[in-house]
Amino acid sequence: MPTSTWNRHHVLSLADFTAAEYDIVLKTAASFQEVLSRRTKKVPALQGQVVANLFFEPSTRTRSSFELAAKRLSADTLNFAASTSSMTKGETILDTAKTYLAMGTDIMVIRHKEAGVPNAIAQEMDRLGVRVSVLNAGDGQHEHPSQGLLDLFTICSLVDPANPRLELLQGKKIAIVGDILHSRVARSNIWSLIASGAQVHLAAPPTLLPKLFAEYIFGEETAPPGQLFIHWQLEPALQDADFVMTLRLQKERMTAHLLPSLREYHQLFGITRAKLQLCQPNVKVLHPGPVNRGVEISSDLMDDPEFSLIQSQVTSGVAVRMALLYLIGSGKT
Protein backbone atom coordinates (compact mmCIF):
# COMPACT_ATOMS: atom_id res chain seq x y z
CA MET A 1 0.00 0.00 0.00
CA PRO A 2 1.24 3.53 -0.80
CA THR A 3 2.94 4.97 2.29
CA SER A 4 6.34 6.01 0.92
CA THR A 5 5.16 9.52 0.02
CA TRP A 6 2.97 9.99 3.11
CA ASN A 7 4.68 12.23 5.65
CA ARG A 8 1.72 13.58 7.62
CA HIS A 9 1.91 12.77 11.34
CA HIS A 10 -1.50 14.21 12.30
CA VAL A 11 -4.72 14.62 10.29
CA LEU A 12 -6.36 17.77 11.64
CA SER A 13 -7.68 19.57 8.55
CA LEU A 14 -8.03 19.18 4.79
CA ALA A 15 -7.14 22.83 4.19
CA ASP A 16 -3.48 22.00 3.52
CA PHE A 17 -3.90 18.57 1.93
CA THR A 18 -2.06 18.12 -1.35
CA ALA A 19 -3.45 16.41 -4.45
CA ALA A 20 -0.94 13.61 -3.88
CA GLU A 21 -2.18 13.07 -0.32
CA TYR A 22 -5.80 12.89 -1.47
CA ASP A 23 -4.87 10.26 -4.05
CA ILE A 24 -2.88 8.23 -1.52
CA VAL A 25 -5.90 8.14 0.80
CA LEU A 26 -8.23 7.20 -2.07
CA LYS A 27 -5.93 4.43 -3.32
CA THR A 28 -5.35 3.04 0.17
CA ALA A 29 -9.07 3.14 0.97
CA ALA A 30 -9.81 1.24 -2.24
CA SER A 31 -7.39 -1.48 -1.12
CA PHE A 32 -9.10 -1.74 2.25
CA GLN A 33 -12.52 -1.75 0.60
CA GLU A 34 -11.40 -4.96 -1.09
CA VAL A 35 -10.27 -6.34 2.27
CA LEU A 36 -13.71 -5.59 3.72
CA SER A 37 -15.35 -7.62 0.94
CA ARG A 38 -13.50 -10.78 1.99
CA ARG A 39 -14.82 -13.47 4.27
CA THR A 40 -12.11 -12.61 6.80
CA LYS A 41 -12.21 -8.82 7.02
CA LYS A 42 -9.04 -8.28 9.00
CA VAL A 43 -5.34 -7.56 8.40
CA PRO A 44 -2.46 -7.31 10.93
CA ALA A 45 -1.32 -3.86 9.73
CA LEU A 46 -1.50 -2.14 13.15
CA GLN A 47 -1.14 -5.17 15.40
CA GLY A 48 0.29 -4.14 18.76
CA GLN A 49 -0.73 -0.50 18.42
CA VAL A 50 -3.32 1.27 20.57
CA VAL A 51 -6.00 3.55 19.12
CA ALA A 52 -7.91 5.67 21.65
CA ASN A 53 -11.26 7.10 20.59
CA LEU A 54 -11.69 10.25 22.70
CA PHE A 55 -15.18 11.46 21.91
CA PHE A 56 -16.35 14.43 23.96
CA GLU A 57 -19.48 14.72 21.78
CA PRO A 58 -22.16 12.15 20.87
CA SER A 59 -21.55 10.12 17.71
CA THR A 60 -22.85 6.98 16.04
CA ARG A 61 -21.28 6.65 12.58
CA THR A 62 -17.91 8.27 13.20
CA ARG A 63 -17.16 6.62 16.52
CA SER A 64 -18.35 3.17 15.48
CA SER A 65 -16.53 3.22 12.15
CA PHE A 66 -13.26 4.39 13.71
CA GLU A 67 -13.52 1.61 16.29
CA LEU A 68 -14.30 -0.97 13.61
CA ALA A 69 -11.54 0.38 11.35
CA ALA A 70 -8.97 0.02 14.13
CA LYS A 71 -10.12 -3.51 14.90
CA ARG A 72 -10.01 -4.48 11.21
CA LEU A 73 -6.35 -3.37 11.29
CA SER A 74 -5.78 -5.54 14.41
CA ALA A 75 -5.11 -2.55 16.68
CA ASP A 76 -6.19 -2.50 20.32
CA THR A 77 -8.89 0.10 21.01
CA LEU A 78 -9.78 2.27 23.98
CA ASN A 79 -13.12 4.07 24.02
CA PHE A 80 -13.59 7.19 26.12
CA ALA A 81 -16.91 8.63 27.30
CA ALA A 82 -16.79 12.07 28.91
CA SER A 83 -19.89 11.40 31.03
CA THR A 84 -18.19 8.53 32.88
CA SER A 85 -14.65 9.93 32.97
CA SER A 86 -12.64 11.90 35.52
CA MET A 87 -13.54 15.06 33.60
CA THR A 88 -16.71 15.07 35.69
CA LYS A 89 -14.34 15.57 38.65
CA GLY A 90 -12.52 18.49 37.06
CA GLU A 91 -9.79 16.84 34.99
CA THR A 92 -8.73 18.93 31.98
CA ILE A 93 -8.80 17.74 28.38
CA LEU A 94 -5.01 17.88 28.11
CA ASP A 95 -4.60 15.86 31.31
CA THR A 96 -7.05 13.30 29.96
CA ALA A 97 -4.99 13.04 26.77
CA LYS A 98 -1.79 12.66 28.80
CA THR A 99 -3.43 9.85 30.77
CA TYR A 100 -4.05 7.94 27.55
CA LEU A 101 -0.50 8.75 26.46
CA ALA A 102 0.81 7.18 29.66
CA MET A 103 -1.14 4.01 28.83
CA GLY A 104 0.81 3.63 25.61
CA THR A 105 -1.65 5.07 23.10
CA ASP A 106 -0.27 5.43 19.57
CA ILE A 107 -3.16 7.23 17.85
CA MET A 108 -5.77 9.51 19.43
CA VAL A 109 -9.02 10.00 17.52
CA ILE A 110 -10.63 13.13 18.96
CA ARG A 111 -14.06 14.70 18.64
CA HIS A 112 -15.03 17.82 20.60
CA LYS A 113 -17.72 20.50 20.46
CA GLU A 114 -15.08 23.24 20.55
CA ALA A 115 -13.03 24.05 17.45
CA GLY A 116 -9.29 23.62 17.88
CA VAL A 117 -9.21 20.96 20.60
CA PRO A 118 -7.58 18.25 18.40
CA ASN A 119 -4.99 20.81 17.27
CA ALA A 120 -4.21 21.74 20.88
CA ILE A 121 -3.71 18.10 21.84
CA ALA A 122 -1.54 17.49 18.76
CA GLN A 123 0.62 20.49 19.68
CA GLU A 124 1.00 19.19 23.22
CA MET A 125 2.04 15.74 21.97
CA ASP A 126 4.60 17.37 19.66
CA ARG A 127 5.88 19.56 22.51
CA LEU A 128 6.38 16.47 24.63
CA GLY A 129 8.33 14.87 21.78
CA VAL A 130 6.22 11.70 21.70
CA ARG A 131 5.25 9.74 18.60
CA VAL A 132 1.51 9.99 19.13
CA SER A 133 -0.67 10.94 16.18
CA VAL A 134 -3.92 12.88 16.49
CA LEU A 135 -6.80 12.44 14.09
CA ASN A 136 -9.55 15.05 14.12
CA ALA A 137 -12.96 13.32 14.20
CA GLY A 138 -14.83 16.64 14.19
CA ASP A 139 -14.17 19.80 16.18
CA GLY A 140 -16.97 22.32 16.63
CA GLN A 141 -17.74 24.15 13.40
CA HIS A 142 -14.16 23.84 12.19
CA GLU A 143 -13.65 20.61 10.24
CA HIS A 144 -14.39 16.90 9.94
CA PRO A 145 -11.55 15.60 7.74
CA SER A 146 -12.44 11.90 7.67
CA GLN A 147 -16.02 12.74 6.62
CA GLY A 148 -14.73 14.94 3.82
CA LEU A 149 -12.44 12.15 2.67
CA LEU A 150 -15.10 9.45 2.81
CA ASP A 151 -17.50 11.64 0.84
CA LEU A 152 -14.76 12.18 -1.74
CA PHE A 153 -14.06 8.44 -1.85
CA THR A 154 -17.77 7.62 -2.22
CA ILE A 155 -18.14 9.96 -5.20
CA CYS A 156 -14.87 9.01 -6.92
CA SER A 157 -15.59 5.29 -6.46
CA LEU A 158 -18.91 5.74 -8.21
CA VAL A 159 -17.21 7.44 -11.18
CA ASP A 160 -14.41 4.85 -11.42
CA PRO A 161 -14.71 1.92 -8.97
CA ALA A 162 -11.43 0.38 -10.12
CA ASN A 163 -9.31 3.49 -9.65
CA PRO A 164 -10.84 6.30 -7.54
CA ARG A 165 -8.71 9.45 -7.85
CA LEU A 166 -9.03 13.18 -7.40
CA GLU A 167 -8.97 14.17 -11.08
CA LEU A 168 -12.23 12.30 -11.75
CA LEU A 169 -14.22 15.23 -10.35
CA GLN A 170 -12.66 17.88 -12.58
CA GLY A 171 -15.52 20.02 -13.92
CA LYS A 172 -18.25 18.11 -12.05
CA LYS A 173 -20.98 20.24 -10.49
CA ILE A 174 -21.57 19.40 -6.85
CA ALA A 175 -24.24 21.15 -4.78
CA ILE A 176 -23.98 21.38 -0.99
CA VAL A 177 -27.31 22.34 0.54
CA GLY A 178 -28.36 23.15 4.09
CA ASP A 179 -26.89 24.41 7.33
CA ILE A 180 -23.52 25.41 5.92
CA LEU A 181 -22.87 28.03 8.60
CA HIS A 182 -22.63 25.48 11.42
CA SER A 183 -21.30 22.54 9.39
CA ARG A 184 -17.77 21.23 9.87
CA VAL A 185 -18.61 18.68 7.17
CA ALA A 186 -19.25 21.46 4.65
CA ARG A 187 -15.88 23.03 5.35
CA SER A 188 -13.95 19.79 4.87
CA ASN A 189 -15.89 18.96 1.71
CA ILE A 190 -15.27 22.42 0.30
CA TRP A 191 -11.52 21.93 0.66
CA SER A 192 -11.47 18.48 -0.94
CA LEU A 193 -13.87 19.30 -3.78
CA ILE A 194 -12.15 22.57 -4.65
CA ALA A 195 -8.85 20.66 -4.78
CA SER A 196 -10.40 18.21 -7.25
CA GLY A 197 -11.36 20.95 -9.70
CA ALA A 198 -15.09 20.47 -9.15
CA GLN A 199 -17.53 23.36 -9.28
CA VAL A 200 -18.97 23.63 -5.78
CA HIS A 201 -22.34 25.34 -5.38
CA LEU A 202 -23.51 26.18 -1.86
CA ALA A 203 -27.22 26.77 -1.25
CA ALA A 204 -28.99 27.80 1.96
CA PRO A 205 -31.12 30.55 3.45
CA PRO A 206 -29.08 33.75 4.06
CA THR A 207 -29.14 33.09 7.80
CA LEU A 208 -27.31 29.78 7.25
CA LEU A 209 -24.98 30.99 4.48
CA PRO A 210 -23.54 34.46 5.09
CA LYS A 211 -22.62 36.55 2.06
CA LEU A 212 -18.95 36.61 3.00
CA PHE A 213 -18.70 32.86 3.64
CA ALA A 214 -16.35 32.29 0.70
CA GLU A 215 -14.08 35.09 1.86
CA TYR A 216 -14.16 33.65 5.38
CA ILE A 217 -13.02 30.28 4.03
CA PHE A 218 -10.52 31.33 1.38
CA GLY A 219 -9.79 35.00 1.84
CA GLU A 220 -11.25 35.51 -1.63
CA GLU A 221 -14.44 34.63 -3.47
CA THR A 222 -13.03 31.68 -5.40
CA ALA A 223 -10.03 29.43 -5.08
CA PRO A 224 -8.37 27.57 -7.98
CA PRO A 225 -8.47 25.01 -9.47
CA GLY A 226 -12.20 24.67 -8.71
CA GLN A 227 -14.80 27.33 -8.16
CA LEU A 228 -17.12 28.14 -5.29
CA PHE A 229 -20.56 29.64 -5.86
CA ILE A 230 -23.06 30.86 -3.27
CA HIS A 231 -26.85 30.75 -3.78
CA TRP A 232 -29.70 31.79 -1.51
CA GLN A 233 -32.16 29.84 -3.61
CA LEU A 234 -32.01 26.10 -4.26
CA GLU A 235 -32.74 25.97 -7.98
CA PRO A 236 -29.49 27.51 -9.33
CA ALA A 237 -27.44 25.11 -7.23
CA LEU A 238 -29.37 22.06 -8.45
CA GLN A 239 -29.42 23.02 -12.13
CA ASP A 240 -27.42 20.32 -13.99
CA ALA A 241 -25.76 19.13 -10.76
CA ASP A 242 -23.97 15.77 -10.86
CA PHE A 243 -24.09 15.27 -7.09
CA VAL A 244 -26.16 16.85 -4.32
CA MET A 245 -25.02 16.80 -0.70
CA THR A 246 -27.61 17.87 1.84
CA LEU A 247 -26.66 18.77 5.41
CA ARG A 248 -28.43 18.39 8.74
CA LEU A 249 -29.91 21.44 10.41
CA GLN A 250 -27.74 21.70 13.53
CA LYS A 251 -30.30 23.16 15.88
CA GLU A 252 -28.04 22.47 18.88
CA ARG A 253 -25.52 25.00 17.51
CA MET A 254 -28.04 27.69 16.62
CA THR A 255 -27.98 30.49 19.18
CA ALA A 256 -30.66 32.53 17.40
CA HIS A 257 -33.96 31.89 15.65
CA LEU A 258 -32.54 31.38 12.15
CA LEU A 259 -35.49 29.65 10.44
CA PRO A 260 -39.24 30.40 10.35
CA SER A 261 -40.14 26.69 10.56
CA LEU A 262 -38.89 23.25 9.56
CA ARG A 263 -41.83 22.88 7.20
CA GLU A 264 -40.92 26.05 5.33
CA TYR A 265 -37.28 25.02 5.21
CA HIS A 266 -38.22 21.68 3.62
CA GLN A 267 -40.42 23.42 1.07
CA LEU A 268 -37.60 25.75 0.03
CA PHE A 269 -34.43 23.70 0.54
CA GLY A 270 -35.44 20.10 1.25
CA ILE A 271 -34.31 17.66 -1.44
CA THR A 272 -37.11 15.70 -3.12
CA ARG A 273 -37.54 13.65 -6.30
CA ALA A 274 -39.34 16.56 -7.95
CA LYS A 275 -36.50 18.98 -7.26
CA LEU A 276 -33.92 16.52 -8.60
CA GLN A 277 -35.46 16.92 -12.05
CA LEU A 278 -33.30 20.04 -12.35
CA CYS A 279 -30.16 17.93 -12.00
CA GLN A 280 -28.35 15.59 -14.36
CA PRO A 281 -30.37 12.42 -15.10
CA ASN A 282 -27.95 10.21 -13.15
CA VAL A 283 -27.62 12.56 -10.16
CA LYS A 284 -26.77 11.04 -6.78
CA VAL A 285 -27.61 12.36 -3.31
CA LEU A 286 -25.40 12.29 -0.21
CA HIS A 287 -25.96 13.15 3.45
CA PRO A 288 -23.32 12.81 6.21
CA GLY A 289 -25.96 11.90 8.82
CA PRO A 290 -27.70 11.86 11.12
CA VAL A 291 -30.68 12.63 8.87
CA ASN A 292 -33.84 14.50 9.81
CA ARG A 293 -36.27 12.74 7.49
CA GLY A 294 -38.72 15.09 5.84
CA VAL A 295 -36.56 18.13 6.63
CA GLU A 296 -33.28 18.00 4.68
CA ILE A 297 -34.43 15.18 2.42
CA SER A 298 -37.70 13.39 1.78
CA SER A 299 -37.94 9.96 3.37
CA ASP A 300 -38.69 8.13 0.12
CA LEU A 301 -35.69 9.69 -1.63
CA MET A 302 -33.37 8.84 1.24
CA ASP A 303 -34.29 5.16 0.93
CA ASP A 304 -34.16 5.01 -2.88
CA PRO A 305 -30.95 3.23 -3.99
CA GLU A 306 -31.32 4.72 -7.48
CA PHE A 307 -30.46 8.16 -6.10
CA SER A 308 -29.21 7.81 -2.52
CA LEU A 309 -25.55 7.17 -1.64
CA ILE A 310 -26.18 7.57 2.09
CA GLN A 311 -25.58 3.92 3.00
CA SER A 312 -22.58 3.82 0.65
CA GLN A 313 -21.12 6.71 2.64
CA VAL A 314 -21.38 4.68 5.84
CA THR A 315 -19.72 1.70 4.15
CA SER A 316 -16.98 3.90 2.69
CA GLY A 317 -16.35 5.38 6.12
CA VAL A 318 -14.80 2.18 7.47
CA ALA A 319 -12.40 1.80 4.51
CA VAL A 320 -11.37 5.47 4.55
CA ARG A 321 -10.79 5.48 8.31
CA MET A 322 -8.79 2.27 7.97
CA ALA A 323 -6.70 4.10 5.37
CA LEU A 324 -6.10 7.09 7.65
CA LEU A 325 -5.19 4.97 10.66
CA TYR A 326 -2.90 2.83 8.52
CA LEU A 327 -1.15 5.79 6.89
CA ILE A 328 -0.43 7.67 10.11
CA GLY A 329 0.24 4.48 12.07
CA SER A 330 2.44 2.58 9.63
CA GLY A 331 5.52 4.59 10.58
CA LYS A 332 5.16 3.59 14.24
CA THR A 333 5.58 -0.17 13.78
From Swiss-Prot:
- Provide one Gene Ontology biological process annotation: 'de novo' pyrimidine nucleobase biosynthetic process
List, alphabetically, the GO terms of the cellular component aspect.
cytosol
Locate the residues binding L-aspartate. K89, R184, R248
PROSITE patterns, from UniProt? CARBAMOYLTRANSFERASE
One Pfam family it belongs to? OTCace
Q: Name one GO molecular function term.
A: amino acid binding
Q: Tell me the HAMAP family matching this sequence.
A: Asp_carb_tr
Quaternary structure annotation from Swiss-Prot or TrEMBL: Heterododecamer (2C3:3R2) of six catalytic PyrB chains organized as two trimers (C3), and six regulatory PyrI chains organized as three dimers (R2).
State the protein's purpose: Catalyzes the condensation of carbamoyl phosphate and aspartate to form carbamoyl aspartate and inorganic phosphate, the committed step in the de novo pyrimidine nucleotide biosynthesis pathway.
Name recorded for this polypeptide: Aspartate carbamoyltransferase catalytic subunit
Q: Organism source for this protein?
A: Trichormus variabilis (strain ATCC 29413 / PCC 7937) (Anabaena variabilis)
